[in-house]
């Protein structure tokens, strides 16, 4: 497993598009949650767009809790995603995707990030769009999520 992880790190440095990045799911990742959490943080801090995106997608796949991932939910995931989103479209979209999935699987953990306007405006907008497009987010949650954006834009208009 350690050799495959090392080869995966080399391969990730060569990835130059979101589709290839999002398809990578080395089986070795699902073996050790503590080690994977450390690796995800390193990928998020790498400064390489698709390595950061891979870290975000991996957090989404493995650390959002029951029914969605191999490991218990990590309450630090929302803050990690916001910090990693940056200014690049592909990393912001991955963070928005993670937040939309978080609103499905860990609603109480992720919703305050929207209601308290803790997301940068563009990431908030992208998250709302991804959540509204999702078939897994129930209609009553979609209504609440939609209102977070309406409230935010109305507050911005008043200033």
Regions found by a protein language model. Give the residues of each.
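Single conserved hydrophobic/aromatic residue that forms the stacking wall/gate
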Residues: 1-11
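Flexible loop/turn segments at the boundaries of HEAT repeats in alpha-solenoid HEAT proteins
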Residues: 5, 34-39, 64-74, 103-114, ...
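HEAT/HEAT-like alpha-solenoid repeats
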Residues: 9-16, 40-45, 79-86, 111-115, ...
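Alpha-helix N-cap/helix-start positions at coil->helix boundaries
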Residues: 17-19, 49-50, 89-90, 121-125
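Structural detector for internal amphipathic alpha-helices that build alpha-solenoid repeat scaffolds
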Residues: 20-31, 53-66, 94-102, 126-134
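A mid-sequence, solvent-exposed acidic-amphipathic segment
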Residues: 41, 45, 49-84
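Glycine/small-residue-rich hydrophobic helix-like segments
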Residues: 86-118, 123
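Eukaryotic acidic, Ser/Thr-rich intrinsically disordered low-complexity regions
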Residues: 112-159
């Amino acid at each position: 497993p350690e050799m495959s992880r090392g080869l995966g790190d080399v391969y990730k440095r060569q990835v130059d598009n979101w589709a290839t990045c999002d398809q990578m799911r080395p089986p070795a990742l699902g073996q050790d949650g503590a080690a994977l959490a450390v690796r995800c943080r390193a990928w998020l801090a790498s400064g390489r767009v698709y390595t950061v995106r891979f870290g975000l997608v991996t957090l989404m796949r493995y650390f959002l809790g029951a029914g969605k991932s191999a490991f218990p939910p990590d309450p630090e995931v929302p803050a990690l995603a916001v910090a990693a989103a940056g200014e690049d479209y592909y990393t912001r979209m991955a963070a928005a995707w993670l937040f939309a999935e978080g609103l499905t699987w860990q609603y109480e953990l992720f919703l305050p990030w929207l209601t308290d306007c803790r997301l940068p405006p563009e990431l908030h907008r992208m998250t709302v769009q991804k959540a509204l497009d999702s078939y897994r987010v129930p209609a009553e949650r979609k209504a609440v999520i939609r209102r977070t954006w309406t409230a935010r834009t109305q507050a911005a208009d008043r200033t």
